[in-house]
Amino acid sequence: MPVRHLLGLADMPAAEINEFLENALPMKQIISRDIKKVPTLRGKTVVTLFYEPSTRTRMSFELAAKYLSADTVNVSASASSATKGESLADTARTIAALGADLVVLRHPCAGAPHLLARMIDVPVVNAGDGMHEHPTQALLDLFTLREKRPDLEGLKLVIIGDILHSRVARSNIWALTRFGVDVHLVAPPTLLPAGIAAFGVTVHDRPEDALPDAGAVMVLRLQRERQQEGLIPDVREYARLYGLNSERLALTRPDAIVMHPGPMNRGIEIAHTVADGTRAVITDQVTNGVAVRMAVLYLLMLGRVD
């Protein structure tokens, strides 16, 4: 049977996305127990290979593996032979020789997980590749959204922030539109990818134009580590024009929810009052991330494609 990977959502059918989400439901029940561990992946080894800094995603994958009783080996770029000039290809061969059963890769170069998947005969999970994709984040966002809004068809969801540099935005757009979500994007023109409207989304320059009737708002941070100079006048001006505050949130439906993939820059893209408000489901996203990643590990290592 061919090795199954999770490299991106751009070409993934809705049925396959749904398979991950459905398998996350029993995983969430497991992590709600006092004793969270089950023996499902006992004897399996998961290697997390992170060439970029990460707190939430790395911890989420580690916990997902541990709750399923898999062993984990955590490798950061600073502690690996990459600092000595070792290529990803050679690292891949080493991982394969050591007997890993699955590799989770985060890398600054778009396409790196695809390259790794061609080199080794074990499942590869893309934990973020450059500005390209972050599929498990989109899966957990979709899972959270369905918990709060079971009928996604026609739901208006507004994404506000640095769309240009966001792999989260790309994966979410591909996933959400497959389930009939009406996706609207808000960003300064300099922070929008060229031709983004061709992805079946509606683009706005001002939050005030997009937020009315929205049932969900997803806020993205300014990725200043990836930006070139001059894309925005300054951070304060951006916060004034695009930050999600209580006044802007009031334009949405009374039951609208607020999402953020983290890390948050409070007072810039999102106000304290909104991030800590009753409509925010940000902590739900974190919890659901573990359940979704448990489902991913299970399906890729033990599950079978219909």
UniProtKB/Swiss-Prot annotation:
It is an enzyme of class 2 (transferase). It catalyses: carbamoyl phosphate + L-aspartate = N-carbamoyl-L-aspartate + phosphate + H(+). Pfam families: OTCace, OTCace_N. GO terms for cellular component: cytosol. Pathway: Pyrimidine metabolism; UMP biosynthesis via de novo pathway; (S)-dihydroorotate from bicarbonate: step 2/3. One of its GO terms (biological process) is amino acid metabolic process. GO terms for molecular function: amino acid binding; aspartate carbamoyltransferase activity. Keywords: Pyrimidine biosynthesis, Transferase. L-aspartate binds at residues 84, 167, 221. Belongs to the aspartate/ornithine carbamoyltransferase superfamily. ATCase family. NCBIfam families: asp_carb_tr (TIGR00670), PRK00856.1 (NF002032). Catalyzes the condensation of carbamoyl phosphate and aspartate to form carbamoyl aspartate and inorganic phosphate, the committed step in the de novo pyrimidine nucleotide biosynthesis pathway. Heterododecamer (2C3:3R2) of six catalytic PyrB chains organized as two trimers (C3), and six regulatory PyrI chains organized as three dimers (R2). HAMAP family: Asp_carb_tr. This is Aspartate carbamoyltransferase catalytic subunit. It comes from Desulforudis audaxviator (strain MP104C). The lineage of its organism: Bacteria, Bacillati, Bacillota, Clostridia, Thermoanaerobacterales.
